């Protein structure tokens, strides 16, 4: 019954610069382009003065308010999809330290104000929202009082949503083998991929289920193989290293480096470490053992 009933506002913060001197201007500019595109896309449904109202505002939170007010005047509601909400905030924490990061995520920081505006209109205009990010750190710092969302990161219902089961990987390889694109036995390729790409699990309640293969890595392997009919020389896709670089910087600047280094050493030597996964924690508490282990989990290690 709700099909085609809502407008969709999709936003991504992945391209916002993390230079503290340019960040807010980049954020406002990025949001302005998104809101302008939204107004043009739905021009036949919105009041004719909507775009003008949006462009008269200087900051993103005010532009969002203008959009929401226009929708409310027309009796319309929207779905908000916010992708990589924490990208530039995490970069600030890694590259510029906690003081700059705190000014962004606490008090009257522009990103915090933007999310406050989102909350203000959830009962009138924003019918549903879907927010994605890398780690729970920024969400904890940004959303005190943002008690309108539920964290689905470790919900067992979604455990199999992103990765591939081994049966799915095998089906993919068998398809290309039948097409004559793969000359190696499928079992041989599975044995190559399994130590590198298998054993992912996204919920403690799913530990007894079959583990998942990293879908990005599997597709990287298959794409490389189809080009050369040989497995890739480097089994790890370099495009997936960004989060590991962030983690390395976090460890280097952390005052408790020695303690957390032992956790990494434990993973290297024993293949695992045990802890309770935290749904969220503030940046100032990253060094606490369970928080640090949780960060490793969210970074996919």
Each language-model region and where it sits:
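Short glycine-rich substrate-engagement loop in P-loop NTPases that contacts/grips substrate
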Residues: 47-69
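Conserved P-loop NTPase "ATPase switch" module shared by AAA+ and STAND
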Residues: 74-104
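Short secondary-structure boundary/capping segments
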Residues: 26-28, 94-102, 142-156, 219-236
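Conserved helicase/translocase motor-coupling segment
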Residues: 207-210, 220-300
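Substrate-engagement module of ASCE P-loop NTPases
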Residues: 66-73, 100-127
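Amphipathic alpha-helical segments of the small helical/lid subdomains adjacent to P-loop NTPase cores
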Residues: 138-144, 152-223
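P-loop NTPase motor core
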Residues: 1-40
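A short beta-strand-to-loop transition that corresponds to the Sensor-1 phosphate-sensing loop
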Residues: 14, 83-84, 113-139, 143-146
